[in-house]
Amino acid sequence: MNFKLSILVLSVILWGCSSGGKVASPWQPAPQQPTPEQPAPEQPAPEQPSPEQPSPEQPSPEQPSPEQPSPEQPDVYTGRIITRDSYVNGNKLINDGFNGDSGIYTISVDTGTPVITPNTSENEHITGHQLQSLSSDDKLLGYYGYVLSYADREILGQNEKYHRSDYILAMNESEINKPTASAQYHGNVFYDRDGAVGQKANIDLFYDSNKSMLTGTITGDSQRDFNFLINNDQKSNNVFEDGTFIAPLTEPSQGSMQGVLNGAFYGKNGEVAAGTIMSSDNESWGGVFGAKVQ
């Protein structure tokens, strides 16, 4: 037994010498192997504010420009022209529209006065004229009157003078205004009768606001028997809501209508009446009139 123990001790000593003198106990735990390094969990980066994107530029709301006053428009005077032209129409009277230009001349309004300017022509000549202005409340409403002229025409080698007479009414149509109260009017008529040109008569009108009725008389001088009753039958409602009117004309000695009066009231409270007269046959007589409240 002691012998076996000695051999065992000796074997141990010899093994220890062969291993560098270090004695490793067979009961020591195996050396700990390093665990593979695990990557640290990625920490979330603090959220960075996204750079502010410029918002698309919005057009600034258009500011209304201050309203500019519109330039004042000149008044326009239009109406009728009744013409007897022996060259063009023989003895017939022609009632046509008028805008200031007759072909032979033009009429413009300068500082409240109608001015006639002859158009350039070597064979047309103005021989006379009379134009009267019509105003209300210091405002020009229009004008009426006549212009006489002649033209040289060569017919079959002969130089002939052909006469023309124009009876003109030109008013500012925007000033038509029906009167609100009964009123009397007095004025003039310029007319042509059977070729006698530039004649003048008186006109008296009465407006009855209760009946919307216009009556009156036209009275010529003693040398020219030019007398008419206006709406002698006294028919009511011959003045319309828009301020225009129409009435038959009869001679005192005749019972039937001989012609027609057409016109309108103009200006403040309808203080002016103006229009045309024309015979039923469009040949015997015709002209224009203007009258103011009395």
For the regions a language model picked out, list residue spans one by one.
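Sec-dependent signal peptide recognition
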Residues: 2-10
